[in-house]
Amino acid sequence: MQLPIVTAAPIVKERAKVFRDLFGDERQYRHFQNYLTGLIVLENKSLANISRCTLKSADKTNLSWFLSEAPWSPREVQNRRIEYMMAQTTSLRQAATASYLILDDALCEHVGSLFEYVDRHYNHSDDSFPLAHNLVTSHYLSGAVRFPIDFELYRRYEEVTRWSEFVFKHFPQQEIPRQAKARAKVHRQLDATLLKDPEFATLDGQFRSKIDLAKSLIEQSIERGLSLTTILMDSWYLSAELVETLRQYQKDWVSLLKRNRNLEVHSFQIKDAQGQPIALEGSHLKVEDFVPLIPQESYRKTRVNEQDYWCFTCCVRIPGIGKVRIVISFDNSQLSGTYAVLVTNRTDWSAKEILDRYLKRWSIETL
């Protein structure tokens, strides 16, 4: 059953007053309140449905015009929202050392392809490629206080540069494979030539990777003066470039570590069950090859949030990242099944401290 929006919800009327001066007239302000009300009370939160349920709107395109054309600044509204949230939670937030910025990404799936920048993005949870907008997001967490900060829209390189179009222009006989590895090979073969085309080169310069977007979100949080010291992130954000940005801003970080990442062999020593050093060949060892070498006796039971984990931790060096501490964690004493690998720049933290911090990242799943 659809609920008609006759007037703004009471909580919206009360809180929206903070934003009143950001809108040029009463109509813009009313659209703002109606849109927020629709997001709260309607199950279907699409713009079309909110417009349909707003009874006092003579023209159902008014709300669309308000969001896309009206002369108000989304950035000013965003900044005011964050300032207001921080001011309202001063007594509830913890110290900066116990506060976090969480980086994540999300797929906003769509049925049709009429939306601007909608594209097929990889969904790692079910190995599919749905039509969606792919957002890189930032969230603030400090004790009981948690709320989203901002987002950046990720656009695939091929979509930004109109890559297929330029391949056909310069290599009309070239077939473009669907498989990722084969497609990557075509990129290596053709992109240097495509970049000689001034139009393609201009589009290439406009592309922003997820790392670029994550850096932007971190910088925005620092410019806003958010009180925090630690960044929590997923494995695909862990790069030399992002780590260097965090080092410059003197921020700590904890991340998942992909199992195919290399460890520098000379940076650690692993011993067998008898305490004898295990000789390792080569200069690098993948995490997935390192884990089977760890004796069961080296794992320690660690309790976090009333859940037991069996953890091994040591300091290693990762190419491009430097010296870090890693934690290999199983959820059972038999060390069977899947495991997680965490990594942090804080080599002085214990396995419990690292686990406890990273597990806070899951709080955003309920936002």
Regions found by a protein language model. Name each.
Residues 1-70, 74-76:
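Gly/serine-rich nucleotide phosphate-binding loop at the start of the catalytic core
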Residues 34, 133-136, 212-219:
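Short, contiguous clusters of charged residues that form electrostatic/catalytic patches at enzyme active sites
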Residues 50, 138, 342:
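A residue-level signal for conserved active-site and pocket-lining positions in enzyme catalytic cores
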